[in-house]
Amino acid sequence: NNDGTDGVVLQALTMQPNIPVYDFDGNWAGPESVNGASQYNPVWLAQMKTNDFKRNRTMGNFYLSADPVKGLNIRTEYGFDYSDNNNRCFIPTYSFGTLISSDTNQIMQREEHSMYWIWKTYANYNKTWNGKHNFGAMLGWEMTKSSWNGSQIVKKGLSSDIVQIVTQDGEFVSNSGWKDGSAMASAFARVNYNYDEKYYVTATVRADASSKFGPNNKWGYFPSAALAWRISNESFFEGARNAMNEFKLRAGYGMVGNSSIDSYLYSAKMSTFNTPYGTGYFMANIANPNLKWEASEQYNVGVDMEFLRGRISLTIDAYYKRSKDLLLRMTIPNYLGGSTTYDDIAAPMVNMGRTSNRGFDLNITTHNIEHQKFNWTSNLVISLNRNNVDAMNSDSSVINGNIDWWSGFQTATRIMVGQPMGVFYGYVAEGLFQNEEEILAAPVQVNDANNPGVNLVNKTTGVYPGDIRFKDISGPDGVP
């Protein structure tokens, strides 16, 4: 189902439930127009079209491991995932009433190939001495690469509905191709030590380089550290072990990076379009050579407890997370490009703003009954999180999250200072209009051009009984 608003799924969702699949004569039933747009019978649509999708996928994982000296293990791993996809869709000539018909068939052939591999090598060293000192260290590197390419051809007016191949005669509707990829290289190290299973310390650092960022900002560096104290192993706790057999305090700090964006946004990409004089090119996006890693820091403290020899366990975690240099697409005026249609110049991806998250998690697990034939375990989880946009490039900056083209790019969410991330933005509903008198007396939702300042009462282009009534939140001069 690759047809968007004309696909089987969306047509089934929008079809009125009182419309039958067949009429009394056994023909396909269904309205021919809804608010001026064609409405397809989804069952007929599913049977009329041929939409074949085939995938050949090969995956594998290999490793070599060696222990050259006591306590030291060296391991190298390699994994890959290769995929070939073939999609063919054929729409024959058809007639479905007076509005939905076509005397021209159409075929679409789409091929895609993708490859992902990861190669990781690391060494682990562990040593214990005097029965109380436990030391561990790890050093390694990792490389990953993803690449994908594809092509698509659409033709219409084939001489036969039977021979459904793209090399048949017909007229080209469109042809397109794409190729993309990304790569990452990483180095990492970790050291951990504990004394007598009482005091624990861990330190980690990793450096990551991503092809998604410009030459000056490919590398990001991310440290972390953790401390823990197992109080239940202290001698002064011995008298309480019958009731509480585990009591551990934890604290940690860590930084992680985010590179979840499309490739090559630090440079300007080019797109093609057809003209009467041949193929033309236009800049697809505004470049940002200073694009860099988004970084998040988190501080957390926690406690682990077990009672009655593990029958009851309690874990509490409190955390504070702060993200900076967020990877967001800047909002720019339409005359600079960056509007919401697909053929405009995309606004630049930039690093801006800060967000914060704070909260706690509580987990209680009880092992109520443990029997050979019956086990009963209960688990209670309580979580509380509060997030906030602390800063943007200016306090008045707003980034809209728009629904796709089929809904006119309406704004559904917003990112703005002082609000949670991605807060829903829209009208406030106050119920449904019951009659025409209510519509005429209500604040204007659709202005009547012939009677300005009053709602237009119209079933398709205005407001009608049964439509949603929106709350008027405007203040002086229309400002909320």
Model-based region annotation:
Residues V201-S210, N368:
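Transmembrane beta-strand segments that form the barrel wall of outer-membrane beta-barrel proteins
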Residues I316:
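Active-/binding-site microenvironments in catalytic and ligand-binding cores
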Residues G60-A66, Y78-Y82, M305-F307:
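Alpha-helical support elements that line or immediately flank enzyme active sites
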Residues A185-Y195:
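Structured alpha-helical segments in the cores of large, soluble enzyme domains
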Residues S211-N216:
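Solvent-exposed loop/turn segments connecting transmembrane beta-strands
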Residues N300-D304:
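Glycine-centered tight-turn and secondary-structure capping sites
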Residues S224-A228, D361-N363:
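Outer-membrane beta-barrel "beta-signal"
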Residues N1-M59, R75-A185, N233-Q298, S313, ...:
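Surface-exposed loop/interface segments of Gram-negative outer-membrane beta-barrel transport/assembly proteins
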